[in-house]
């Protein structure tokens, strides 16, 4: 490396943190594609084994250095305040896809994090969700169970190609730091966030218990949405921003704001359904 540190040592010291979304097969393929790309990047540095090792390549390169260390965390984007126990289904699906994708460790977000500081009960459930995958489903006994699946293999290759092209375009523009300072990375992520919020609002993306099969009899009571308010992630403070920041609003935030406002007012809004055209054809 430029600092004179052997590439094998540097590669082994790097650990990646990923978020896990609710798209089951896509998430499995995402982690597989990430490992593939990282192995190719490390191989380009031709890392040398610094000790006697059986895991060497044809040219003597250290294959251990190409192993990607990944920690994953379930998403908060799709967590909801209302019908909060459905969050357990979301995080369990996400944890399962991450385990099948080959992550080394993971954090399962407690189901009540959206409206309170997680208590002992919700944290215990979050731990048990991982234990179920390990002790009941034996996910720790298999390596890359998705290998050979036509759908997942093709999805892996597709993600890897798209990610590599994006990586090259960022490098050609001056690198990630330049892109971060210019705000192009944040703009792309925020645009994706905006598109997903629109899809949820139009019910093109289903959020169970929010825009599909909501429980209208449920009352929020003392629940209040807990959202990060400043660029450093705090709730009640502001800080100066050297770069543009990301938008972390959850998918259900607009729906929840309407329901909380309605509940606080004590009056349900009325909607007039205007029928147009031939009723027999509807």
What do the predicted segments below correspond to?
Residues 14-26, 74-78, 107-115, 141, ...:
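Glycine- and acidic
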Residues 17-21, 71-75, 91, 108-111, ...:
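Generic beta-strand/beta-sheet core signal
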Residues 21-33, 74-88, 116-126, 151-166, ...:
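Short glycine/threonine-rich loop-to-helix capping motif typified by GTGT followed
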């Amino acid at each position: 490396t430029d600092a004179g540190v052997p590439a094998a040592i540097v590669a082994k010291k790097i650990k990646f943190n990923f978020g896990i979304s609710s798209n089951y097969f896509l998430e499995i393929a995402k982690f597989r594609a990430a490992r593939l790309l990282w192995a190719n990047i490390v191989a380009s540095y031709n890392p040398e084994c610094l000790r006697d090792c059986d895991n060497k390549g044809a040219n003597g390169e250290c294959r251990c250095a190409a192993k990607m260390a990944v920690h994953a965390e379930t998403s908060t984007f799709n967590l909801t305040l209302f019908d909060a126990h459905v969050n357990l289904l979301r995080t369990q699906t996400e944890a399962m896809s991450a385990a099948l994708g080959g992550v080394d460790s993971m954090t399962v977000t407690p189901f009540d994090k959206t409206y309170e500081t997680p208590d002992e009960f919700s944290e215990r459930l979050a731990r048990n969700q991982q234990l179920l995958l390990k002790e009941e489903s034996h996910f720790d006994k298999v390596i890359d169970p998705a290998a050979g699946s036509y759908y997942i293999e093709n999805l892996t290759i597709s993600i890897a190609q798209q990610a590599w092209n994006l990586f090259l375009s960022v490098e050609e523009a001056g690198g990630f730091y330049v892109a971060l300072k210019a705000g192009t990375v944040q703009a792309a992520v925020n645009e994706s966030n905006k598109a997903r919020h629109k899809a949820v609002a139009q019910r093109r993306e289903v959020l169970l218990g929010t825009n599909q099969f909501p429980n209208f009899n449920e009352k929020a009571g003392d629940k209040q949405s807990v959202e990060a308010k400043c660029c450093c992630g705090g709730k009640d403070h502001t800080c100066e921003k050297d770069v543009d920041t990301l938008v972390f609003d959850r998918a259900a935030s607009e729906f929840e704001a309407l329901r909380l406002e309605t509940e606080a007012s004590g009056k349900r809004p009325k909607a007039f359904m205007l029928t147009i055209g031939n009723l027999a054809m509807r």
